[in-house]
Amino acid sequence: VCTGRRAFTESLALDKAGVSTERGVVLTDGNFRTNVENIWAIGDCVGGMMLAHNAAAQGEYVADLIAGRHNGVNLKVVPSCIYTVPEIAAVGLTEQKATEAGYEVSVGKFPLGANGKSLIAGRERGFVKLVFDKKTQKLLGATLYCDRATDMIGELALALANGMGK
């Protein structure tokens, strides 16, 4: 069961500062600026992927913007995960999103039932799916639905961030 999360902003007195919210979520632009000058928001209070590693990447991004630097943090390669059994982890574009973005995609999907280690461990339920740009052969995204998916997604995020492919 996944129950989801919600932003907990009630105690921040955002209304007194004039910061716009919607259903408890702080509204920001593409660079985490709120509608009030010099007030930025990151992490769970802005909704989206509510995970510590995502908030840390957002914090690094915003700190550099405030300091007048552009650090090149690519928030599109920050993985997401769901701690279910089996786990779900993803990074980059799904097949559908890649197609909608105009890519001609090629997809590789590997069922865990065909993996010896998974069979021995009795954890053959699941798959690994990789989405590539058919023209350049570069990785566009990955989805893992398997035991320890959240432990393995980092390597695929690294490959995606570095423009690696087949």
Annotated model-derived regions:
Residues R33-T34, N38, N74-L75, I120-G122:
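Solvent-exposed alpha-helices and their adjacent loops that cap or buttress functional pockets
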Residues N38, V78-P79, L140:
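Short amphipathic alpha-helical segments
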Residues V26, V78, F110-P111:
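Proline- and acidic/polar-enriched loop/turn elements at helix boundaries
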Residues Y83-K166:
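Flexible, glycine-rich terminal cap/loop adjacent to redox cofactors
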Residues G24, P79-S80, V128:
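Small-molecule pocket liners
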Residues I42-T99:
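A conserved FAD-binding loop/helix module that cradles the flavin
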Residues V1-I66:
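FAD-site-proximal beta/loop scaffold in flavoenzymes
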